A protein has these predicted regions:
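Solvent-exposed serine/threonine-rich low-complexity stretches and specific carbohydrate-binding patches
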Residues: 76-85, 173-189
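Short, hydrophobic beta-strand segments
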Residues: 91-96, 185-205
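Short, conserved beta-strand segments of beta-strand-rich sandwich/propeller modules, principally
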Residues: 98-102, 142, 208-210
Length: 228
């Protein structure tokens, strides 16, 4: 289910019981549910691998999967294959150092899926992605704003304050990121949380809708949507 406002304690604004947050961003629990309820091979690795200041500390690494087994690689070196029971998850303990962790899922002894996280550099560029297909006049379109580093990798810890601007074919009806964010929902300025912000735009007419995102010290982003 989805997070929703209420049923929580101050200063949180919402319950955090859902697999998808209030801003339509998928949490790790979403992938856990997918592993439990779907058959198409999938695997999801957590957490991300940006932990400055924690070098040398042990971090628990998990994988949610519907595969028979999962194998973790740290900088290309295997840290062991885990045989899985139904509804189980794979787990390892890894000493943190910047680099890359990757997990491979196997069914009947054959690789069928993989997921990976890599330590990134500082974020330098904003990006925008439209999450709503086949947008029509009168619809609300949902967008995700995120960041990339100098090598084009998404940065999961980025938290710049972002300002959204839309052309005359749309009106920003809401933005959202963290459950602790007390800015008005309709504000076009919001701080990113866990590397992402969602923005909802009401499409007021047919044509090319343009949404722009700006943040100090970042290359700006823009995205165009053909509204029918």
């Amino acid at each position: 289910g989805f997070d929703h406002r209420g049923e929580t304690v101050w200063p949180r604004l919402s319950s955090c019981s859902g697999a998808i947050d209030m801003f339509l961003l998928k949490k790790d629990a979403f992938w856990h549910n997918k592993a439990l309820w779907t058959r198409e091979p999938m695997i999801h690795l957590l957490p991300h691998w940006n932990h400055p200041g924690h070098e040398g500390e042990i971090i628990k690494v998990w994988a949610y999967t519907n595969c028979d087994s999962a194998e973790l690689f740290v900088d290309g070196v295997s840290r062991g294959k885990v045989e899985l029971q139904p509804h189980d998850h794979a787990a390892w303990e890894v000493e943190y150092h910047p680099g890359k962790i990757e997990v491979v899922g196997y069914k009947d002894g054959r690789e069928c899926c993989r997921d990976a996280h890599e330590t990134t550099n500082a974020p330098v560029k904003l990006m925008l992605r439209c999450e709503t297909p086949d947008v029509k006049a009168g619809d609300s379109a949902v967008f995700t704003c995120y960041t990339l580093d100098s090598e084009g990798r998404e940065v999961p810890t980025a938290d710049p304050t972002v300002r959204f601007v839309v052309n005359k074919l749309g009106v920003i009806s809401g933005t959202g990121s963290a459950v602790y964010d007390h800015e008005p929902v309709k504000s076009n300025i919001r701080r990113m949380y866990a590397g992402q912000i969602s923005a909802a735009v009401k499409c007021t007419g047919k044509g090319i809708l343009a949404l722009y995102a700006y943040a100090d010290g970042f290359e700006a982003a823009r995205v165009y949507v053909d509204v029918k």
